[in-house]
Amino acid sequence: MKFISWNVNGLRAVLSKGFEDIFKQLDADFFCLQETKCQPDQVDLSFDGYYQFFNSAERKGYSSTAIFSRKKPLSVSYDFDDMTDHPKEGRIITLEFEKFYLVTAYVPNSKDQLLRIDYRLQWEQAMVRHLNSLKQKKAVIYCGDLKVAHNEIDLKNPDINHFNAGFSDQEREAFTNLLSNGYIDTYRFLYPDKVEYSWWSYRSRAREKNIGWRIDYFVVSEDLKDKIIEAKIHNQIYGSDHCPVELDIDL
């Protein structure tokens, strides 16, 4: 099975940049989108043979996620079970299938000067609880814009970013904690020394210079380790400040 995850930085915007052709070209069984920045009724989009699921923020034009799936899920849920401490920002979709759960997420940004780091860490803890509750029942595939470059190999300029959002010690430790709960970073599992990025700032011609970060992931529960076939970063595909990432897995 082929899975794609892509932060499109605005679905309506990327539709004018060839999104439908890219979607068909990648030909995935599951296509997960983050930062769609829209309500379902704001886009006229439908692909033959796919079920569509949208989770939109209460604040229009902000955050939000979507999944297109060739398989009909057994169940669909949105956000965490307990949203008492979380604003409705449309960040999570969970689909249940016969053999696995698929979770896509648009992780909260810790902001400049780490102004939102406390909430970010609270959110990370809630996500680990969510994934672990699913993992008790069946295998888990977790993907999305996870907003962290885990190790120095995962960004171009680690030395100047240790106190910046996405590479702070706290965020990196939170990702380490996630993996320690029985999960695998599929790309790094297959390619421990490969340097590729999935996000580039719009500033200073960063993409042209390949001054990037790897912050988009497919993470799977350890029981799927032997089923991983390939993990790719499609850095030749434009349309957003992120590029699509791919997981091929035998399910």
Task: Please provide the spans of the model-predicted regions.
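N-terminal, active-site-proximal structural segment of metallo-dependent hydrolase catalytic domains
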Residues: M1-F47, A57, Y62-S63, Y78, ...
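Structured beta-strand-rich core segments of catalytic domains in phosphoester-bond hydrolases
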Residues: K37, Q42-S110
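Conserved beta strand-loop-helix elements of the APE1-like EEP
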Residues: K60-V76, R205-D226
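Surface-exposed cleft-lining segments at the edges of enzyme active sites
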Residues: D81-M83, P108-E124, I160-F163
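Active-site-proximal beta-strand elements of phosphoester/diester hydrolases
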Residues: M1-N9, K99-K111, C143
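Active-site beta-strand termini and strand-to-loop segments that position acidic
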Residues: R70, L95-E98, S221-E222, L247-L251
